[in-house]
Amino acid sequence: MTALAELTADLLAAVEAAPDLPALEEARVAALGKKGRITAMMGDMRSLTPEERKERGQQLNALKDRVAEAIEARRTVLKKEALAQRLEAERIDVTLPVRPEAEGRIHPISQTIDEIIAIFASMGFTVAEGPDIESDFHNFTALNIPPEHPARQMHDTFYLPPAGDGAARVLRTHTSPVQIRTMLQEKPPIRIIAPGRTYRSDYDQTHTPMFHQVEALVIGEDINMGHLKGCILEFARAFFQVDDLPVRFRPSFFPFTEPSAEVDIGCSRKGGELKIGNHGDWLEIMGSGMVHPKVLENCGLDPARWQGFAFGMGIERIAMLKYGIPDLRTFFEADLRWLKHYGFVPLDMPNLAQGLTR
């Protein structure tokens, strides 16, 4: 066997014997590297005659190509074997149950606000917002609330240090200031709802220092009590999803509406369990009335031309009634177990076409 044939056999045997990719790389360097055996033989051609150098060069180039092809073929085999070993070691049992996915839940307050907006949007209302810190004028005076009214007392209202001009400031006790700001800034007709946070100095099972309200305001020409009743009736039946839900209006008093009425819905309390529907008993859910002429005048509107109605309710209260939540304070305790129980599926926005809650 010639030296070239012996070299060919040795190099190919080393390639085929490589058990893994690092060993194959060592075989490649030993054959084709700068100090490899083929490279060394090419360096020895300087002592040959031109004819011999040409013949030996062709032989070594052919050997170089053959070894390179053998290396690539062996590399492909080794990669497949390595992949097969990895797949065997990392095998997944597809019959095992999947890992539980952590999924957030929509808070009942957020869900209830979305439901309210969906209902009133279908009646042409838009959403209006205002600041939580209000002036005495927007929170009390413009709403025809006299200075001696109990709502202005320190034990009911959170007062803040006066503004730079000395004007009294409070944490708003209702979202009615949004109605005042809207009437001052926009021209009638007006049809808005104003959901948001409100603040009162109270804390027990049915009261918290901060809670949410939504109020509605409609201003236009020839608006009357019939429009108010029809709007509330449609809302109550859509929200509680009871088509024949009875709704009752009881005369009441609010400084900012005249006439004023408390709104009750039908219910049952048999066996200590509250059920919404036509069951012979009544439950109050909101206050309402025709906007007081003095309030219209305070906002620069002529009561002889413009009339309107307004109503408002506590968002937590109607959420508790609809979803059977017994304690108002739990809305704000950040208990994930409570939220998992009473929360709602994310991205499932309520609408009247598919149903408010699913």
UniProtKB/Swiss-Prot annotation:
Entry-linked Gene3D superfamilies: Bira Bifunctional Protein, Domain 2
GO MF, one example: magnesium ion binding
Protein's organism: Rhodospirillum centenum (strain ATCC 51521 / SW)
Signal peptide range in chain numbering: none
InterPro entries: aa-tRNA-synth_II, aa-tRNA-synth_II/BPL/LPL, Phe-tRNA-synth_IIc_asu, Phe-tRNA_ligase_II_N, Phe_tRNA_ligase_alpha1_bac, Phenylalanyl-tRNA_Synthase, tRNA-bd_arm
Designated name of the protein: Phenylalanine--tRNA ligase alpha subunit
Needed co-factor(s): Mg(2+)
Catalytic class of the enzyme: ligase
HAMAP family in UniProt: Phe_tRNA_synth_alpha1 (MF_00281)
GO cellular component, one term: cytoplasm
Protein family (similarity comment): Belongs to the class-II aminoacyl-tRNA synthetase family. Phe-tRNA synthetase alpha subunit type 1 subfamily.
Cell compartments where the protein resides: Cytoplasm
Oligomer status and interactors: Tetramer of two alpha and two beta subunits.
Cofactor: how bound: Binds 2 magnesium ions per tetramer.
Annotated catalysed reactions: tRNA(Phe) + L-phenylalanine + ATP = L-phenylalanyl-tRNA(Phe) + AMP + diphosphate + H(+)
